[in-house]
């Protein structure tokens, strides 16, 4: 039983929630849904919420939530430990959260290696966008990897467990036949069931299984809470896939076709959820690409509900979208040029975003009363030169002049903030085939950028961590041996820099041997 302070903290979180499911523990088959990060981050994830609702809609299944906030881990709804559940399913959205999968198992008292777990332990399943990109780092620790959209995979997976409960080998054998699903090599060896062929430390990753049509099930937040990144907001998924093919992005090259939810269904979802909140967030890889986005904005204007967007491609944003955003009380706009120079933007697949288009969007945002701007840029892009890096502060200086002119009617100059990241090549994307910049060159470019940004007035920024980018690169590109890197990080208490140093030392010794 968790201590008093933990029970109080959990109760406060639950009392702040609106919506959701409460079933008595022990009344059904049980699935513990684990988001390997904090409650604040996990409950901001729409995919996590969709899975939670889908499982609970099966009358003979109970789904409860786990996060990393509590030690030892406990289910939010029943306070049960992870070992009490039939299945533990991890939803991983960020590569660095693979570390938290390992740490969660250790803190739960569950043998972290699949080969060491017998049938008395929960079945450990992993899904999420990260296993689409690269499941290799996590294979040593889980039994089953599901590379499929939840509404496609869950009915069959839960049915098979119901049919074979008590016979781990039979369940894994049957699950291995499902499209997009595979038993990891250590679990396959332990239970003598079919698993993927391992060659040179790698396994063939099945293509993601997708739902051919959207709209049959609600793709919305079903638990609303102030304790998320999007406080008291219902997220609404407009589309999946992406109509663009940016050369650095996994989605447009691997998760298509682009599928949209019809306008009338979106209207129904929003109307039904007005009892929970007046705030709605539209989610898609490219919100402005929905063919009826302007009509949807007009509908929200009629209802007088507040709207925000998960991503805004400056190439396609419309005036109606900006007007709806301003009417909703937004004071800031976020766009992602990704590079300061048009040469690099063209390389990234953003040839439709010249400076003129970017300035048009910003000018209209200022005119509509949104004085604050946030820009996303990457450093370390293949072929990047010092001139490309210097193009970022130069672009900001020009923006500052626009800010001064555009802010006069409002009596104050807005703020300009940057989100800077180090480019990490993603497998199965065109830029992954380019020769990466040497680490020392990236470090030099970051130093140049920091010096120049400090000379630009009224700009807020924080330099990205090169160490975290290197760790992410190992996990995004690594083979089955990258599980050793996660173990090093765990041995160093989550210190990625220390893990990188030891990883490099091990690699150097291997070369010398």
What is each PLM-predicted segment?
Residues 68-197, 427-479, 487-498:
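Glycine-rich beta-alpha loop elements in corrinoid/cobalamin-binding modules
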Residues 33-34, 38, 96, 267-374, ...:
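Conserved SAM/AdoMet-binding glycine-rich loop
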Residues 1-20, 27, 31-33, 446, ...:
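Radical SAM enzyme core and accessory elements
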Residues 50-62, 301-302:
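Short helix-loop-beta junction
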Residues 48-50, 140-142, 161-162, 253, ...:
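Short secondary-structure boundary/capping segments
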Residues 3-32, 39-40, 186-235:
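N-terminal [4Fe-4S]-dependent radical SAM core
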Residues 188-190, 244, 291-293, 320-321, ...:
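Flexible glycine/acidic-rich beta-alpha junction loops that bind and position SAM and/or redox cofactors
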């Amino acid at each position: 039983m968790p201590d008093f302070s933990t029970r109080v903290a959990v109760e406060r979180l639950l009392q702040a929630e609106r919506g959701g499911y409460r079933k008595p523990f022990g009344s059904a088959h049980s699935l513990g849904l684990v988001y390997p990060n904090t409650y604040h981050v996990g409950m901001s994830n729409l995919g996590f919420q969709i899975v939670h609702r889908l499982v609970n809609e099966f009358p003979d299944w109970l789904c409860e939530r786990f996060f990393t906030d509590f030690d030892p881990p406990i289910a939010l709804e029943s306070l049960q430990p992870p070992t009490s559940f039939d299945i533990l399913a991890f939803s991983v959205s960020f590569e660095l959260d693979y570390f938290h999968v390992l740490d969660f198992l250790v803190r739960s008292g569950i043998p972290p290696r699949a080969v060491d777990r017998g049938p008395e332990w929960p079945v450990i399943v992993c899904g999420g966008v990260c296993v689409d990109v690269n499941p290799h780092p996590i294979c040593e620790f889980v039994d089953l990897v599901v590379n499929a959209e939840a509404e496609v995979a869950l009915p069959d997976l839960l049915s098979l467990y119901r049919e074979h409960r008590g016979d781990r080998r039979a369940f894994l054998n049957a699950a291995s036949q499902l499209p997009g699903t595979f038993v990891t090599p250590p679990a396959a060896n332990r239970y003598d069931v079919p698993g993927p062929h391992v060659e040179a430390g790698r396994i063939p990753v099945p293509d993601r299984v997708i739902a051919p049509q959207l709209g049959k099930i609600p793709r919305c937040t079903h638990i609303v809470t102030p304790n998320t990144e999007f406080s008291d907001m219902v997220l609404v998924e407009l589309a999946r896939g992406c109509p663009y093919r940016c050369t650095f992005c996994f989605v447009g090259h691997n998760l298509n076709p682009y599928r949209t939810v019809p306008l009338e269904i979106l209207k129904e979802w929003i109307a039904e959820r007005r009892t929970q909140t007046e705030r709605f967030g539209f989610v898609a890889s490219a919100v402005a690409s929905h063919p009826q986005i302007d009509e949807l904005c007009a509908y929200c204007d009629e209802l007088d509900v507040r709207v925000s967007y998960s991503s805004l491609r400056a190439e396609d944003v419309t005036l109606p979208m900006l007007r709806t955003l301003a009417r909703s009380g937004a004071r800031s706009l976020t766009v992602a040029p990704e590079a300061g120079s048009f040469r690099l933007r063209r390389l990234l697949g953003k040839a439709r975003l010249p400076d003129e288009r970017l300035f048009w969007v910003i000018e209209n945002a200022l005119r509509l009363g949104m004085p604050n701007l946030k820009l996303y840029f990457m450093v370390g892009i293949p072929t990047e030169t010092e001139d490309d890096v210097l193009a970022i502060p130069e672009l900001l200086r020009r923006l500052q002049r626009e800010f001064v002119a555009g802010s006069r009617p409002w009596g104050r100059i807005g703020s300009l903030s940057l989100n800077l990241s180090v480019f990490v090549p993603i497998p199965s994307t065109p830029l992954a085939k380019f020769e990466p910049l040497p680490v020392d060159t990236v470090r030099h470019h970051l130093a140049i950028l920091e010096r120049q940004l400090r000379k630009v007035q009224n700009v807020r920024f924080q330099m990205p961590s090169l160490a975290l980018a290197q760790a992410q690169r190992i996990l995004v590109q690594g083979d089955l041996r990258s599980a050793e890197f996660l173990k090093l990080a765990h041995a160093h208490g989550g210190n990625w820099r220390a893990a990188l140093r030891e990883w490099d030392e091990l690699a150097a010794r291997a070369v010398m041997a």
